[in-house]
Amino acid sequence: MSNRGQLSIEMVILVLAVLVSGSYVALDLSKGAFETTAVNDVQESSYCGFTPDFGATSIDKALVKLTTGIININPNAAVTNNEFNATYTNTTDNTVVTYSLDNVHPNLIKNYADGTIVKVPLNETWKNFTASNIILRMKSDYVCTINGENVSMESNCFEITAPLGSDSFDFQMSAGTGAGQYYLRLVDQEVTIEFSLE
């Protein structure tokens, strides 16, 4: 087995072990670790649904695709580099709702196919998405840290899959304590993995 393949398996096993153990993990990723100093490719594409509290009825086999761009911004400033968006597709009737972040105010924007726009305040309790996996693609010359231990990124990506015995886990975006900081949190069975993008 190649070192790259072995590393990838070891990383997944490590993450799964941490999730099952119930401990808290903080994974700090600087903006410089991503191509063009941004989160270019943080995406999830699988058959799953939003939680009902998110404002969309949870529908079996609904396709959710998340793409995150530059998220280390101040939501209260009139900026244009806020590139977070998510698309909810009901595979039963093919209706689509897209989600984005307000460039001026800390709101989550829901855009419906009929042109209706609904703004939801973004706060620490921003509701969860449900995912079966999420991939962070990073530049090969950077490392990430899990529980204080550096993990080589030779495979150029960091993939987290659902814990053993689970088909999915929840993740959410929420504002941090500092101005312009956002956090992507993966939550499953009271376990949180936090990606701090600063």
Curated annotation (Swiss-Prot):
Designated name of the protein: Probable minor pilin MMP0709
Note on domains (UniProt): Contains an amino terminal motif QXSXEXXXL, which is part of a class III signal sequence.
One CC-aspect GO term: cell surface
Organism in which the protein naturally occurs: Methanococcus maripaludis (strain DSM 14266 / JCM 13030 / NBRC 101832 / S2 / LL)
The record's account of how the chain is modified after translation: The N-terminus is probably cleaved by the prepilin peptidase EppA, which recognizes the class III signal sequence.
Changes seen on gene knockout: Disruption of the gene does not change the piliation compared with the parent cells.
Localization of this protein: Secreted; Cell surface; Fimbrium
Keyword Secreted attributed: yes
Propeptide: 1-5
Key words, A-Z: Fimbrium, Secreted
Family annotation (InterPro entries): Class3_signal_pept_motif
Sequence motif QXSXEXXXL, residues: 6-14
A matching Pfam family: Class_IIIsignal
Presence of keyword DNA damage: no
Signals that turn on the gene: Expressed under standard laboratory conditions at 35 degrees Celsius.
